[in-house]
Structure formats: structure tokens, C-alpha cells
């Protein structure tokens, strides 16, 4: 194990870790079907979405802030409130039109986190497979809002 030789660097790392600290009562988790991968989602006290990931209880993604910035618009990085969480599990097989395999198994657990900030609604959907995970942002239809994709 390497010793941190720069006290300023150690202080910076500590400040970063504390800045994305979550409220323990609002932490949601979803794991892979085999239980090896676990994703934790929470909001900081400032309403910033964060997630972390572990594999066999070892960290693979430290607490990381989520959100994004849109040109000429307010950033979608904080001030959110969690309105609900929906979880589901999928185990299906489908046949590709072409390729090496006749069938592909689609086996994952999903967690959709519903967030709001004022009249803005945003969902973050996590899918966790036995061999990896992903997430995406979804914007449900909203009155008086127009999005261009």
C-alpha cells in the first residue's frame, strides 16, 4: 500500500468523499441476478443524485455524482427529490435476425428512480446483469415542456 505523501492531496480526497455523502435513509439498491454486482443510489442532502457500484463487496465505482449540463439551460445536477422507486426483474430469451447465436438470454434486475425538481421530472433507470450494469436518464412527458432529441 502506498503512503500518501502530500497532505494537501489527502485533504482534497477527503473533501471530495464528504461532498458526495448520502443520506442513509434514502439509499436504494439493486443487485445482479447472481448477487455479485450491487448498485447503490441516493440523493445527497443537496438533492444531488449519486451512485456507487461493488463487485463481490469490493468497490468498483466510488460514490459518483450523476446528472448533466445542457447548453443555455440550468444544470440537471442537484435540487432533486426522490418521488419513488420501481424495481423489476427480467429473464427472457430472444432470437437475433443474424449473428453467431440462435438465441440470446436477457437476464437482469432493474431499478427506476423517479426524481423531481419543481415541475421537472427525471427518471434514472439502472439495469444490472451478471456481467455488468448500465444506467440511462429518462424524461417522462411533462406539461408545458418541450424536448428536442
What label would you give each PLM region?
Residues 1-10:
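Bacterial N-terminal signal peptides that target proteins for export
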Residues 2-3, 23-25, 36:
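Bimodal feature
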Residues 9-19:
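Bacterial N-terminal signal peptides
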Residues 18-29:
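Bacterial Sec-dependent signal peptides at the C-terminal "C-region" and cleavage site
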Residues 27-149:
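N-terminal accessory beta-strand-rich subdomains and adjacent acidic, glycine-rich linkers
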Amino acid at each position: 500500500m502506498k503512503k500518501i505523501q502530500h497532505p494537501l492531496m489527502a485533504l482534497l480526497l477527503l473533501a471530495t468523499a464528504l461532498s458526495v455523502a448520502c443520506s442513509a435513509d434514502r439509499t436504494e439498491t439493486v443487485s445482479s441476478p447472481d448477487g455479485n454486482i450491487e448498485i447503490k443510489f441516493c440523493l445527497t442532502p443537496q438533492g444531488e443524485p449519486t451512485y456507487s457500484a461493488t463487485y463481490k463487496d469490493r468497490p468498483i465505482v466510488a460514490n459518483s455524482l450523476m446528472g448533466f449540463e445542457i447548453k443555455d439551460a440550468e444544470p440537471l445536477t442537484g435540487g432533486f427529490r426522490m418521488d419513488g422507486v420501481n424495481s423489476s426483474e427480467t429473464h427472457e430469451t430472444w432470437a437475433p435476425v443474424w449473428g453467431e447465436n440462435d438465441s440470446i438470454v436477457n437476464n437482469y434486475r432493474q431499478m427506476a428512480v423517479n426524481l423531481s425538481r419543481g415541475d421537472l421530472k427525471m427518471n434514472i433507470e439502472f439495469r444490472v446483469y451478471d456481467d455488468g450494469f448500465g444506467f440511462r436518464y429518462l424524461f417522462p412527458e411533462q406539461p408545458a415542456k418541450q424536448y428536442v432529441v
